[in-house]
């Protein structure tokens, strides 16, 4: 299965991209501040030493959300910055923290096609069963994006194939791509065969 090309945004447009991604959040409350926390800004800029100094100062809240409820780890996931993600997790942040729309860091990484960060979060024990506000799990999103690189990774990591979103759809039901459907069916058949052999 070939990987799906995902458009990457250069670092100069990171803040603008953030604002566009969260534009819907502004509609929740006209009085809600849209000012980005300083730690979030530092993570967007991608300077690990600056982020480390801020965290080590003890003057920042590692679980603070922006106006959309995105925590620092969500931002590290969006930027694909493993060094920052590692440091945040080592400081005890919640790997499965949810924003205002139920999105966890691994869901953010999947949406952005941040393959290495997804693998990193899996290695640290991210929950693959948690869905967003629409109950879409990481595998649902990878299938929706037709991400041929992430789908095998998520399947191998044990993503639930029978998880249903709010439309009562399992991951295989959110695509019409025959190659993806065939791949998931073959994976499922192989897993079932392996389980049968283990039971003998």
From Swiss-Prot:
Source superkingdom: Eukaryota
UniProt name for this protein: Ankyrin repeat-containing protein DDB_G0279043
Compositionally biased region (Low complexity): 9-34
ANK repeat start-end pairs: 34-62, 68-97, 101-130, 134-163
UniProt keyword list: ANK repeat, Repeat
SUPFAM superfamilies, sorted: Ankyrin repeat
Pfam families according to UniProt: Ank, Ank_2
Region ranges (Disordered): 1-34
SMART domains membership: ANK
